[in-house]
Amino acid sequence: MITEFAKEIIKNADSCGAQDIYVIPRQDNYELYIRVGQERRLIDVYRPDFMASLIGHFKFVAGMMVGEKRRSQLGSCDYDCGDGQRVSLRLSTVGDYRGLESLVIRVLHSERRELVYWNQGIQPIMDALDYRGLYLFAGPVGSGKTTLMHELVQERFKGQQVISI
């Protein structure tokens, strides 16, 4: 039952283009949200024991320590939704003073979009890459900061192997 519910959550989030899934403990229950763009949508409210099992499922699949509920943990996986569909996920958990965990899942969509709107103003940024130093990219969630950085590096270091952390 938990596995099927988890697959359904991931499939729905992927199909509607959600960036994040939130499992948040409240006073007497857990709330499940998805974030699409800048909008966080409440999906439903669930019993704490059911959502604790769901969090345990995702932690197990992502290679995290299932029994550790106090310390923050990070994990990632290619989640098998069935029917040959795999969705890349990044997971983060954190416990509260009551021993309840919250879970945030970042859905890493695989489609590659052409960045045509950056082509006009990209040359000054490319010129700045010739100088050593720290480059700061800022903006709201989902605005393309990481995508821009990867595009700049791919353009600047064509034909070379680049590893990002």
List each language-model region with its residue ranges:
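Conserved lysine of the Walker
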Residues: 145
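Hydrophobic positions on the alpha1 helix immediately C-terminal to the Walker A/P-loop
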Residues: 148, 152
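P-loop NTPase switch/communication element
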Residues: 153-165
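Active-site catalytic microenvironments for nucleophilic, acid-base chemistry
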Residues: 12, 61, 155
